Amino acid sequence: MASNDEGMAPSLGSPWASQTGPWDAILKAVKDQLPSLDSDSSLSDYGEEELSIFQRNQTALIPDLSEELAEDPADGDKSRTWAAAAEESLPEVCGTQKSVRLCVCNPALVPAELATEPGNRRNTRTKDASSQEGRDPGRPVETSGEVSAFLGMAEETPRWLGSDLGSLSFNTKGSQGPPWDPQAKASLSRHEGDPKAEPASQESVNRRALRQERRKMIEKDILQKVTRDACGPASSDQGGVKEAPCHAVESAARSKMPLAEPPEGPPVLSLQQLEAWDLDYILQSLAGQEDNQGNRGPGTVWWAADRRQVQDRTVPSADDRLMEQLALLCTMQSRASACAWKVPADTPQDTEEAGAGSRCSSRKPGSEAGPGPQLAQGMRLNTEPPTIFIDLRQTVPPDHLSPARSRGSSHSSSDSEEEEEEVEMAALGDAEGASPSSLGLRSCTGKSQLLQQLRAFRKGIAQPKLPANKGPGGERAQAPEDTAASGTVRKQHMKLCAKGQSAQARLPRGRPRALGDAPEPGAAREALMPPLDQL
């Protein structure tokens, strides 16, 4: 390197040196204050012009091994070149016949003198190791930034010794071949008692102590807890101590476990048992809690049973309600089309209820004309929802209307013709007070209106003709002209007035007169039924 430096440095007699004279003086004055590019070689012995970072040879870029090779006289020569080992997978055998050393390099840097062919590898390593044996037979050769372990192996009891870690060594049982032979069985063991390795393996001793403490903690705190929880359900019925059987099971499992298995076997076995026992343990613990809390368990069972019964009742009730609605619709249509001889049987359900209420109130003396419209209006408010049975949009269950239906039918069978006339008179007063505007304001669909008109027309055709002396408006029209005319002429006049009023009552509803032959008492009775508009 000195020759290269001298060749690269300019000579003093050259014209280049004369031109750089002032710059050299400036450099000398400022050099002490400028930081060096290479801190280790800032004050170099080679001269001012040497910059070791740029003038270094390519072979010098290998990590500096001067500290490791300073004590070795054979390796003290700095002109020795280094090369990487040709075989990285196989360890290098470098030792004598008594103690053979193995160097595992990944990747290792060994001198070129030692990197020879595999055929005469053992002889060359023996010669080199014999020269180094007097110096330090147990010291390994290390490289900066890489870990290389020399593993000593004797003929009788060979061992692999780790230099840096110093805690692990692999014992080879009864095999004279190399340790990487598949027939050689390696087992984990500790290397202790080497006084030279004690200062270097101080960290390994601490690690070993930490591992032992951790293993003890796992065995005491975790394994015993797992086995105790697993054995708890089995011994809960007996009521004895739970920990004793668990420890017995744990000791038995350890005794049955072969010696070749690692010490981490018990946790795996206990975890496998825990997976099998988890569900049973949860069920038994819940059963024990329910027994301790008293009647909570049966209560929950009863609640679940009641809930099932409620569900069983509510699910068919919806179907039953729908079937009742369909059956009611069918009966209403059959009643409208069939020939009925009594008014309460022909009227729908809400009109039956209204008629029954009006009949009950009309039985009292002096209440023939006054309470009729009021009761009709009250019933109209109570039975307001339109098209309940036609569109099957029922807001109130039909069970509430069944008593009224039965009461209406009983009254219809037991009432006399005089009560029928009183009901017709009360309905006539209500029909006269009602206006077409009030009927049009009610919320009903077009379909419901058409069905109402069709039902009213069919009922008007099916109703029989009543006698002349029992006309619908006879007694009511008789009151205003009571003092003006005689008996026979007055009856005939009342018949004509009743016919005119029935015709006027049919016209505002938009029903054509051609559908009916002539204004008959039956048609007048049909017009006197306000609840028909509410269906």
UniProtKB/Swiss-Prot annotation:
GO terms for cellular component: cytoplasm; dynein axonemal particle. Residues 415-424 have a biased composition (Acidic residues). Its main location: other. The modification Phosphoserine is found at S175, S362. InterPro entries: DNAAF8. Keywords: Cytoplasm, Phosphoprotein. GO terms for biological process: outer dynein arm assembly. It is found in: Dynein axonemal particle; Cytoplasm. Residues 166-175, 435-444 have a biased composition (Polar residues). Residues 112-215, 228-267, 344-380, 395-444, 461-535 are annotated as: Disordered. GO terms for molecular function: dynein complex binding. Residues 125-139 have a biased composition (Basic and acidic residues). It holds the Pfam family DAAP1. In cyliated cells, dynein axonemal particle-specific protein required for deployment of ODA to the axoneme. Interacts with outer dynein arm (ODA) subunits. This is Dynein axonemal assembly factor 8. It comes from Macaca fascicularis (Crab-eating macaque). The lineage of its organism: Eukaryota, Metazoa, Chordata, Craniata, Vertebrata.
